[in-house]
Each structure stands twice: as C-alpha cells, then as structure tokens.
C-alpha cells in the first residue's frame, strides 16, 4: 500500500489556522458579483444539529468557505492561442486536485436538466423495495438489470464505516436527527443517469469539458461512470471521507492522474453545507489512512479541507485520488450534481476493474468500445439540441470513421449501459 506525504503540513499549506481561529460573527460572504448563495441561515441550522460541537462546526463551515475562495483554482474554461487548455488551469488542477470552472452551463441547459430532474423524481419508486411510483406506474429503472437508485435514511451516512464500495469509506460521519415529517428513506444517488435523462446525456458531450478531458487524459480517453447526486434540504445523506481509486495504488506506474477524474456539474450551486469537501493536494499523496487523519484532526472536520463552492451552471473537475466527502445536508439549499468521469485509456485497458460500479471484469478493447458508444450518442444528441455549437470530435470515433444518431434505437442500445462502467 502506497502512503506518502505530510498530511498535517498539507492542511497548513492551504488554510493556515483558519479552521481553528475564525471570527464566527463574519457570517455574510460576498463573492465576485454577488452571484453566490447567502447560506448564513443554513450554516446556523447545520451547526445547531451538532450539539456541543455546534460552535466548532459553525467555525469550520465558515472558515472552509473563505479558504476555498482564496485558492487560485476558479474561473471559466480557457484556451490558449493554439487551442489548448490554458496552462494556468492545468497547473492549478495539478496543484490542488480540483478546479472550479465557472459559468460552463448556460441557463437554457440548466433549465433542460431541471425539467428532466422534476420528471425523474416523479417516477422514483415510493420506497426502496417498491417497483411503482406514487401514481402506481412502473417506477424508474424497474426494468433495469444494473444498479440505479441508492437510498439512505434522511441525513444518514449509508457507506461510512462499512465494507461497501471495497471499504473505502473508512469512517462513519455524524448523522443528525432528521425532522419527524421526513420520509423513512430517500434516493440520493442515481446511477446510469445518461439512460434516464436526455439533458444529462447532452451535458456529457459538452465540447469544452471534453477538450479538458483530452488535455488531461489524452485524445483516446475512456469513459468511467455517470451519476446524479441528490442532496435535498434536511434529507440529503452524507458521503463519508474517501478516495475513489481502488486499483492502482501499488502500481509501478502510479502518478497523480492514474485513477482519472470526475466532472461535477452543479444545477443549484454547491455550498459549504451541502457540497463536497476536498483536501487540496491529497491526490498526490497515495492511499491515505483516513482513520488516522480524522484522529489527528480530533473530529470528522478534517483540517485543511475546503468545500467546492459553486454557482448554478459551474462545473468542478475533481481528481478521483483526492480525499473528499460531504456532510449531511442540514441546510435549506438543495444540491443536484450531474457527475461524470473519464480515464486515461492506459489506466483501464487490460486492467481488472475494482468491482464497485460494475461487476469486476478485465477491460479489453471490446468492452471499452462498447462503453464508449454512449459518448457517441451524447455528441449526436447535443448536436441536435445545440446545432450552433462546434461538436467535439472524439479521436477513437474519427479513426474508425464511426458516426452516431440519437434515436429510439440508440436509446435501446444504452439500456443498462452502466454494466460496463470502467470502475478502477
């Protein structure tokens, strides 16, 4: 097992002593052109659920947000004169393990996603073991052979401290008491999301984002997995601190990008209360002993971590090796994250998968090609919806003279497509 780096030093590098000595009277946070949400009430509501730890939680949330916004890893997707991704973006991504791309999705695209989300929620099963929705119709995914909905009790942490997902969520997060009128369980992850939402499928083919994927993983980059993360106010579950990668920690070719990355497109924005927190620079440190890190921080409030603070339409790129997690959404703002990731082809070709998102299998050229078809359909669907855009040209398709059409036959072809998620 590869373990490296000075984690305590890493924390000091990014946020100094802010986590312990922040003036909690400074509750209003002004950003840019005041586009960000005022989450003062949510911070108070969240902190209040932590009992004797309320003041510490309040200070942590406030300090984390200030520290996040002080980092130089935020701005629009930019290209240099040669058409390549701007060097400062790649450098900041390498330094911190994440970058916030601002204003990527237009309001029109956000509205498309929102309309799909409303329809999807109406078709969710009424309970984890149900196959019908609230109207008695067959529920979303009732004909699926692959996993789709992941449920949790309100404000719970269903993965932390368990052996699920290969035991990568090593610690259990605090689970606040939810209000009496909340449901017994609620969906908080939808897997295989491109099958269920045309709008998310189109976002998957966003040409600027795919150019970023090419810059980091090469022109023959490979798909990973797609999901929606649903963090409803007063309900949304925690995702305990973890690193996504499971396969290459001991590889002789190990480096900071070997496990790929995820894009996280934010429909409603993301805050210190409802958003993902990341320990900057941790993607370079190998596999981390999270229990020891929590112990040294004296709580689940890991020193030096910062939240992904986003506005509507922003998209984060986050390295899958970075230590990250999220607290239960005890605030008043929802978070809906359209999540999709990509790998280097060399990281998956001939490699046996980790078995988290799909059955463990050795990924050969045939499986990678089959899993990549959804990208071809996504590019075609986006071209139809946004004909004024210059569509992305995916090198493996161009080399094989492949073309795709988004129609009913294509829709049938991606049924249960996530059985081939390239999970490493």
Locate the predicted segments by residue.
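Non-heme Fe(II)/2-oxoglutarate
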Residues: 38-54, 63-79, 123, 131, ...
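Short, structured patches in soluble enzyme cores that scaffold and shape functional sites
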Residues: 227, 232, 243-245, 265-269, ...
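Acidic, His- and aromatic-enriched active-site or binding-groove loops in soluble protein domains
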Residues: 241-260
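Non-heme Fe(II)-dependent double-stranded beta-helix
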Residues: 37-95, 102-241, 247
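Double-stranded beta-helix
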Residues: 257-261, 268-327, 347
């Amino acid at each position: 097992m590869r373990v490296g780096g000075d984690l305590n030093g890493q924390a000091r590098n990014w946020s100094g002593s802010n986590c312990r000595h922040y003036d909690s009277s400074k509750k209003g946070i002004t950003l840019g052109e005041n586009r960000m949400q005022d989450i003062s009430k949510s911070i108070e509501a969240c902190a209040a659920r932590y009992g004797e730890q309320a003041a510490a939680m309040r200070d942590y949330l406030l300090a984390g947000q200030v520290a996040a916004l002080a980092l130089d890893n935020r701005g629009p997707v930019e290209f240099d004169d040669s058409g390549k991704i701007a060097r400062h973006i790649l450098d900041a991504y390498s330094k911190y393990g994440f970058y916030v791309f601002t204003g990527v999705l237009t309001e029109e695209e956000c509205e498309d996603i929102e309309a799909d989300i409303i329809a999807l929620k109406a078709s969710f099963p009424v309970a984890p073991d149900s196959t019908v929705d609230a109207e008695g119709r067959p529920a979303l995914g009732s004909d699926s052979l692959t996993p789709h909905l992941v449920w949790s009790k309100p404000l719970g942490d269903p993965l932390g401290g368990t052996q699920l997902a290969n035991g990568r969520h090593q610690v259990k997060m605090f689970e606040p008491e939810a209000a009496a009128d909340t449901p017994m369980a609620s969906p908080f992850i939808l897997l295989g999301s491109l099958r269920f939402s045309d709008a998310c499928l189109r976002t998957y083919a966003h040409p600027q984002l795919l150019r970023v994927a090419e810059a980091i993983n090469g022109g023959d980059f490979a798909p990973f997995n797609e999901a929606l993360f649903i963090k409803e106010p007063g309900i949304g579950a925690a995702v305990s601190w973890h690193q996504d990668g499971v396969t290459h920690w001991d590889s002789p070719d190990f480096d900071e990008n070997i496990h790929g990355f995820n894009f996280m497109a934010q429909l409603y924005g993301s805050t210190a209360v409802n958003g993902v927190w990341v320990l900057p620079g941790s993607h370079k440190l190998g596999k981390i002993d999270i229990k020891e890190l929590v112990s040294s921080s004296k709580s689940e409030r890991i020193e030096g971590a910062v939240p992904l603070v986003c506005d509507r339409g922003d998209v984060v790129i986050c390295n899958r090796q970075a230590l990250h997690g999220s607290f239960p959404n005890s605030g008043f703002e929802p978070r809906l994250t359209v999540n999709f990731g990509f790998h280097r082809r060399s990281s998956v070709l001939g490699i046996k998968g980790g078995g988290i998102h799909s059955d463990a299998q050795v990924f050969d050229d045939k499986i990678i090609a089959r899993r990549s078809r959804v990208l071809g359909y996504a590019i075609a669907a986006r071209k139809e919806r946004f004909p004024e855009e210059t569509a992305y040209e995916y090198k493996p398709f161009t080399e094989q003279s492949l073309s795709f059409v988004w129609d009913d036959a294509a829709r049938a072809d991606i049924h249960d497509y996530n059985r081939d998620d390239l999970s490493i």
